[in-house]
């Protein structure tokens, strides 16, 4: 049984997204996984969900380095969504390396819960759930 009803991966790395979705289903972490290749596609889709009165995913796994709209730009726009519609969403930044500068910057965003290192594993997802 899934622990999370819905989550979202925002990352331009198709290989990472595919493997993470597969892992999530294998361990029963989440059944409904949305994937967006850049921040603009994600913000447009999430706003569309709200327009249709569909709640936002409970968890967002966000890469920082993407074309079009990167993770930081996504976070800026995400803050424009009314607080009552986003306050239960946990954002986890996912990155291939830990940058002290990025970790410090992430603390400026109330929605950011933690900074995770790629690839995500069953153990790292257990800590999220």
What positions do the PLM features span?
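Conserved acidic segment of CheY-like receiver
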Residues: 5-15, 20-24
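A Lys-centered signature of the CheY-like receiver
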Residues: 117-118
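Active-site residues of response regulator receiver
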Residues: 63
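Helix N-cap/capping motif at the beta->alpha junctions
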Residues: 35-48, 71
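Alpha4 helix (beta4-alpha4-beta5 surface) of REC/receiver domains from two-component response regulators
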Residues: 73, 86-89, 97-114
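His-Asp phosphorelay/catalytic-motif detector in bacterial-type signaling
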Residues: 55-59, 84-90
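Receiver (REC) domain active-site loop signature in two-component systems and cognate sites
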Residues: 66
């Amino acid at each position: 049984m899934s622990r999370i009803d819905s989550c979202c991966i925002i990352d331009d790395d198709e290989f990472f997204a595919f493997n993470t979705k597969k892992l999530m289903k294998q361990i029963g972490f989440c059944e409904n996984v949305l994937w967006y290749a850049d921040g603009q596609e994600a913000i447009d889709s999430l706003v569309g969900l709200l327009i249709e009165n569909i709640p936002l995913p409970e968890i967002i796994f966000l890469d920082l380095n993407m074309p079009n709209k990167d993770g930081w730009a996504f976070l800026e726009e995400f803050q424009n969504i009314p607080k009552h519609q986003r306050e239960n969403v946990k954002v986890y930044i996912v990155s291939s390396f830990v940058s002290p500068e990025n970790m410090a910057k992430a603390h400026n965003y109330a929605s950011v819960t933690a900074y995770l290192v790629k690839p995500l594993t069953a153990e790292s997802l257990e800590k999220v759930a």
